[in-house]
Amino acid sequence: VNAAYSEYDYTDQQQQIIVVTQSGSLAGKTFNAGESEMTGFELETKYAITDNTQIDFNYYSSDTSFKSFVIPTARPPLNFTGNQMNYSPESAYNIAFTTVSDDDSSILRVAYSYKDEYFMDPSNRYISMQDSYGVANVSYTKYFTDDWKMKIFCTNCTDEIYKTQVTTFAIPYGGGGRNYYANARRIGVEITKTF
């Protein structure tokens, strides 16, 4: 079992934001968040059920905020003070079950990960929010010889739809966003030859 507690204070943390400039044009610019802070707790555990089977469990929690983040040059001026930092869910965890055959020729792994809701933009607008979600992955690897192996896998087995990135646009220009999504469910077989 490993556990850790952390505290970070940032000064002039850089953020890229699309804003309306003083000339009225739309532009992506880099700004410095005056002050921001993050506290976090991590727990990592590994438990051997048998000589061949292990369970891993990891947990993470965080509390983040921009203590001072004002952009007076934007039109209209922007104030993100008090907002949650990007990509910082309050809690997240993953659990995995791994078992190995007696002769070490095959490995079965089942894993599940979960994240609370979080924002992908310092504005914390709804358009940039990712709802809480969980992802399940399964894989089975078979070693036929030292040179040949086969892997059967399923990633995102429950076909969860979740965003990996959001580009938000300035409110005077409609305030919408462009979403980028993770891969859907993937099922496949890989055969590998080592030379």
Annotated model-derived regions:
Residues 16, 72, 166-168:
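Short, glycine/charged-enriched secondary-structure capping and boundary segments
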Residues 2-9, 25-123:
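Gram-negative outer-membrane beta-barrel transporters
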Residues 125-127, 168:
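Short glycine-enriched, charge-decorated loop/helix-capping segments at active-site entrances
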Residues 113-120, 141-195:
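C-terminal beta-signal and adjacent terminal beta-strands/loops
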